[in-house]
A protein has these predicted regions:
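Short alpha-helix adjacent to the SAM-binding motif of class I
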Residues: 321-332, 336
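SF2 helicase/translocase NTPase motor core
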Residues: 339-341
Length: 341
């Protein structure tokens, strides 16, 4: 008999006791009960905390922070510790840089958004470095290579990712559909198996100059190392369960992800991803405390999503100004200071 428990402890005890006895569950009720508990109390119940945690978009104005930076504080080669996360200002294609970032550790999941090699233009047709008609005044490194140079660049990055990750790693690799062949060549060259394409369906279109139809999606390659078995959190085990799912649960299994874009004027990068986008990937392909690798940090969306879901993000960014943006974003959200590693 357990006595002298406060309300949270009593609720956690009831859930844990029933779970130990393998009781039948009304999962909707369980989730509602879990939502009333603090994070540390959820852990003692034996239930997966991912059941109830949903990522929240932060209010950070990445574009304003980027524009306000006159001279970056970060320098090439700098490494920062952001709580459990690591951030390096370095080159993802250079093996030595990635080795320093990983610090002897291996990642279990990859979620990364490399330059698409499309020489991004603003809606007005100007280079993305222009501030007119939607440009940021910055530039995207490695976004205008020849096909051969781009294949070589992607291949180097993918070899590095393979070297510094576990054998059961899953990779999510965003790309531009017009360069599908380049990405597939690089996957093949670096011995990655490409399993399927995931589609991010946006709530608004992108004006696509020179194309018959405007684009409203971005594709992502899902894969793993050839001849290896990748990890996946398999919550649905049989067809009967699928037919009993609510739509909100069922859609988590689909290869089309509908997530709203960030407001375009807030973009610090043209392919910037909302924090909710990595959520289902992180829950499907990693566990709490796993290391998630992102070698193209951008504005820090992967790192911030990992932070909310108790994963550790090891991320690389070549542009020192973006490194400063990521640090400011983390510090604003957590109230903690980044430290030089």
């Amino acid at each position: 008999i357990v006595v002298d428990l406060n309300e949270q402890e009593a609720r956690a005890y009831r859930l844990a006791d029933n779970k130990l006895n393998e009781s039948d569950w009304d999962m909707d009720l369980v989730i509602e009960e879990l939502k009333l508990l603090d994070k540390e109390k959820i852990e003692i119940t034996g239930f997966d905390i991912d059941l109830i945690i949903e990522i929240k978009e932060d209010e950070f104005d990445a574009q304003k922070e980027y524009d306000d930076i006159k001279e970056a504080v970060a320098k090439l080669g700098d490494i920062y510790q952001l709580g459990e996360h690591r951030l390096m200002c370095g080159d993802s294609a250079i093996r030595e840089d990635v080795e320093k970032l990983m610090d002897g550790k291996l990642g279990r999941m990859i979620f990364t958004d490399p330059p698409y090699n499309v020489n991004y233009k603003s809606p007005g047709g100007l280079d993305y470095s222009s501030t007119k008609f939607g440009g940021t005044g910055g530039k995207i490194f490695n976004d205008n290579k020849s096909d051969k140079d781009c294949v070589d660049f992607y291949t180097d990055v993918l070899f590095n990712l393979s070297h510094f990750t576990t054998d059961d790693v899953t990779i999510y690799w965003w790309f531009a559909n017009k360069n599908n062949h380049i990405n597939r060549f690089a996957f093949e060259n670096a011995d990655w198996h490409m399993s399927q394409i995931i589609i991010w369906l946006k709530n608004s279109l992108v004006f696509s100059r020179g194309q018959d139809y405007h684009r409203q999606y971005e594709p992502c390659m899902l894969g793993w190392k050839k001849k290896k078995t990748h990890y996946k959190n398999k919550k649905i085990t049989n067809l009967k369960d699928v037919f009993n799912l609510d739509f909100d649960d069922y859609k988590e299994m689909l290869d089309v992800w509908y997530e709203k874009r960030d407001v375009t004027q807030n973009y610090v990068h043209p392919t910037q991803k909302p924090l909710r986008l990595p959520e289902r990937a992180l829950k499907k392909s990693s566990e709490k405390n796993d290391i998630v690798v992102d070698l193209f940090g951008g504005s820090g969306s992967t790192l911030m999503a990992c932070h909310q879901l108790d994963r550790k993000c090891y991320t690389m960014e070549l542009d020192p100004k973006y490194v400063d943006v990521i640090i400011k974003r983390y510090e604003n959200y957590t109230g903690q200071k980044a430290k030089k590693a």
